[in-house]
Regions:
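Structural boundary micro-motifs
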Residues: 1-155
Length: 155
């Protein structure tokens, strides 16, 4: 994984921490040397290992983790359900949802306007909503940094 992709993945995952994003963790255990794989909720353990390559073994000190990776389960924007679209439509009028973006109109004074600028608080609301619903808005699935959760029962 390139440093650029590693930083992109880490920034994306840190924004998702409050929402309990699950993913596939693969690593070689430092004590036994055996490979381990499983589905985990991303947490501070993963941040530590992704950034330093080590984890705390308590009385044994820090141990190096080899071959570590974490791939979150995310949904492509195109997999948004009708219920999710209705929830999003309360704040924005969704014109189209594409594999790499959402085209929206902004609601103002009783009508939908494509020319109005979306204010900062609304963008924050949208990003938090996308994180809460585990949507891939960074293109991580396409880059092989995340697993497409469509059709999987992981949440």
């Amino acid at each position: 994984m390139t440093q650029e992709n590693k930083e992109l993945l880490l920034r994306d995952l840190c924004a998702r921490l409050p929402y309990g994003v699950r993913g596939e963790r693969i690593w070689t255990a430092p004590v036994s040397g055996s490979p381990e794989k499983g589905i985990y909720v991303f947490d501070t353990f993963d941040i530590n290992v992704l950034t330093t390559g080590y984890y705390d073994c308590g009385e044994y000190g820090f141990r190096e983790v080899r071959n570590y990776s974490f791939k979150p389960y995310l949904f492509p924007l195109s997999s948004m359900t009708e219920e999710q679209k209705k929830e999003l439509d309360k704040k924005f009028h969704v014109i189209g949802i594409y594999w790499n973006n959402i085209k929206i109109c902004y609601h103002s004074e009783g009508y939908w306007d494509t020319d109005l600028e979306v204010d900062f608080q609304d963008w924050l609301w949208l990003i938090n909503w996308l994180n809460k619903n585990h949507f891939d808005y960074h293109g991580l699935i396409e880059k092989g940094l995340a697993i497409d959760a469509s059709g999987l029962n992981i949440y």
